[in-house]
A protein has these predicted regions:
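Short secondary-structure boundary motifs at beta->alpha junctions and helix caps
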Residues: 10-20, 79-119, 123
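Generic preference for hydrophobic/aromatic residues in regular secondary structure cores
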Residues: 1-5, 65, 89
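N-terminal segment of the mature soluble domain
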Residues: 1-50
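Short, highly charged C-terminal tails/helix-capping segments
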Residues: 119-140
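Surface-exposed short loop/turn segments
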Residues: 31, 35-79
Length: 140
């Protein structure tokens, strides 16, 4: 598990000595997304998500928050043509300024990330400008 002391060394990540994630953060986020975003048999498009940040950030000695930052891209069925792109940045206050508080905050932040992605994907399909083109590109 990584953390950053924003009040002292904002650009330097550090690791908790005795705390580890059960799996790499990207895998944990992927599992949560698969649960929240059921496969849509009507779409041939793919979603690519790059996880840029999965860190507990301490703004003060006794307060922290989870930061989950990612880049989402909706890709055409074949090739790497990007049909839509979105940057996401989710923060969630940790209930305690320690590793276990960070876990709770990251769980909530990851769920919120999935909710925002679901809303974004639904919005793309119903967008007045460009939504039809994306629907045609993603049609099976």
């Amino acid at each position: 598990m990584q953390y950053r002391l924003e009040y002292a060394q904002p650009s330097q990540r550090q690791a908790y000595a005795e705390s580890r994630w059960a799996s790499p953060p990207a895998e944990l986020v992927e599992v949560g997304l698969r649960r929240m975003l059921p496969p849509d048999g009507r779409s041939a498009c793919r979603l690519r998500l790059d996880l840029d940040e999965f860190t507990q950030v301490y703004g003060t000695h006794d307060g922290s928050q989870a930061l989950v930052a990612a880049r989402a891209e909706l890709l055409a069925p074949r090739g790497d043509t990007v049909l839509a792109r979105r940057d996401l940045r989710i923060t969630e206050v940790a209930p305690r300024p320690d590793a276990s508080g960070g876990v709770v905050a990251h769980r909530t932040a990851s769920r919120r990330l999935a909710e925002e992605l679901a809303g974004w994907l639904a919005g793309i399909a119903s967008a007045p400008n460009g939504g039809d083109a994306i629907q045609r590109a993603c049609a099976r």
